[in-house]
Design a protein with these regions (language model features):
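Active-site- and interface-proximal helix/loop "cap" or "latch" segments in soluble metabolic
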Residues: 4-181
Length: 181
C-alpha cells in the first residue's frame, strides 16, 4: 500500500473542511524471472468533512468504497477525454504491465504530470499513473513466493473505514483517519 494525502481543506465560516486521504493498493504476481504475471490496482479516496469547531460531519460508521467498487459511480468517465472510468483505466494499466519486468514498467514514458505519453497506453489511460508505477514497483519488491503460479487469478480486496476518527475538543485536536485492511 502507498499513502498520499491530497486535497484537504480547512473549514471556514462559509464551507465545511475536508480531510482527504488517498490510499493506493497494488497486488502483483511475479515469476522467478522477474516478469509480472498478473496485476491488480485499486485506490481508496477517503473524504471526511468537519466544521470550524473540529466536529466531524461525515458518517463514521460507513465503509468507504474503493474506486474499483465504485465503478461508474466514481464519475471519471464523464470528464475523461476517452470516456473511460477510473476502474477501466486502472485495469488497462494493470493489463499493460503484465508480461513486463519492473525495469520495463519503470521505463513507461510519462509526462511531468505523471500521465502516459506513449500511444500504446494513451488510447486507454489518460489519468496520472506515476504513483501507480511506483506502487507496482513496491508491490513487486515486496512479493514473496507463496505458491501462486502463472495463470492463477489474483484478487485484491480491501475494507476501509474511519471509525476511529474523533472530534476535536477543547482539550485535544480531532483526528480524521482512514483505516484500510
Amino acid at each position: 500500500m502507498l499513502f498520499r494525502s491530497s486535497s484537504s481543506k480547512d473549514a471556514t465560516a462559509d464551507a465545511d473542511g475536508l480531510a482527504q486521504a488517498d490510499i493506493t493498493v497494488v497486488a502483483v504476481t511475479v515469476g522467478d524471472d522477474g516478469i509480472i504475471y498478473d496485476c491488480v490496482i485499486d485506490s481508496i479516496q477517503s473524504k471526511l468533512n468537519f466544521d470550524t469547531s473540529g466536529a466531524l460531519l461525515s458518517d463514521l460508521t460507513l465503509t468507504i468504497p474503493s474506486k474499483n467498487e465504485l465503478g461508474a459511480d466514481y464519475g471519471m468517465g464523464k470528464i475523461s477525454s476517452i470516456g473511460r472510468e477510473w476502474n477501466e483505466q486502472a485495469q488497462s494499466l494493470a493489463d499493460y504491465v503484465v508480461g513486463k519486468t519492473i525495469p520495463e514498467v519503470k521505463g513507461i514514458s510519462i509526462s511531468e504530470e505523471g500521465k502516459p505519453t506513449g500511444a500504446d497506453l494513451t488510447a486507454s489511460v489518460t489519468m496520472s499513473i506515476g504513483g501507480y508505477i511506483s506502487a507496482i514497483e513496491q508491490a513487486a519488491a515486496n512479493a514473496s513466493h507463496l505458491g501462486a503460479s502463472k495463470g492463477d487469478r489474483l484478487v485484491l480486496t480491501t475494507t476501509t473505514n474511519a471509525a476511529k476518527s474523533t472530534d476535536a475538543t477543547s482539550d485535544a485536536d480531532g483526528l480524521a483517519q482512514a483505516y484500510a485492511t
